[in-house]
């Protein structure tokens, strides 16, 4: 998933796409901020990543599975989500549709 997110960030970031990774740790060592920073560098993640140690964001989206992708429009409404790997073309099509929308 990270390669696709990286590609979309680089391709559409200047067109308004904002990518934010949500890191919800599964293991105790993943809670350490330095370990997360190392992983961001090692995996060449160019977009923002938040550390969700207490799971507040995870719970707010009623998330039970990862990876999960959410697309939120410019007005803050959830417009698309996908659970698991795959559906990359469908997700990119949804990104393009949202970027094409105009807002007052």
Predicted regions and their residues:
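Short, internal strand/loop/helix patches
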Residues: 18, 34-73
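A short acidic, helix-capping loop that chelates divalent metal ions and anchors anionic groups
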Residues: 22, 30, 78
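Residue-level recognition of beta-strand->loop/alpha-helix junctions
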Residues: 23-25, 51
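Short, solvent-exposed loop/turn and secondary-structure capping segments
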Residues: 1-2, 32, 61, 81-83, ...
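Extracytoplasmic/secreted proteins, especially bacterial periplasmic and envelope-associated proteins
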Residues: 4-7, 31, 35-38, 56, ...
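Thiol-/selenol-based redox modules, centered on thioredoxin-like
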Residues: 16, 65-104
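Generic structural signal for helix capping and beta-alpha/helix-loop junctions
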Residues: 27-29, 57, 86
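Conserved helix-turn-beta segment immediately C-terminal to the redox Cys motif
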Residues: 1-23, 40-43, 97
């Amino acid at each position: 998933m990270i390669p696709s997110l990286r590609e979309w960030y680089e391709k559409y970031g200047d067109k308004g796409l904002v990518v934010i990774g949500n890191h919800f740790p599964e293991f105790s060592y993943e809670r350490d901020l330095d370990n997360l920073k190392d992983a961001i560098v090692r995996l060449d993640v160019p977009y923002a990543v938040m550390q969700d140690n207490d799971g507040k964001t995870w719970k707010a989206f009623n998330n039970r599975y990862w990876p999960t992708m959410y697309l939120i429009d410019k007005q803050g409404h959830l417009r698309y989500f996908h659970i698991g790997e795959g559906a990359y073309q469908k997700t990119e099509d949804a990104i393009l549709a949202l970027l094409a929308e105009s807002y007052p």
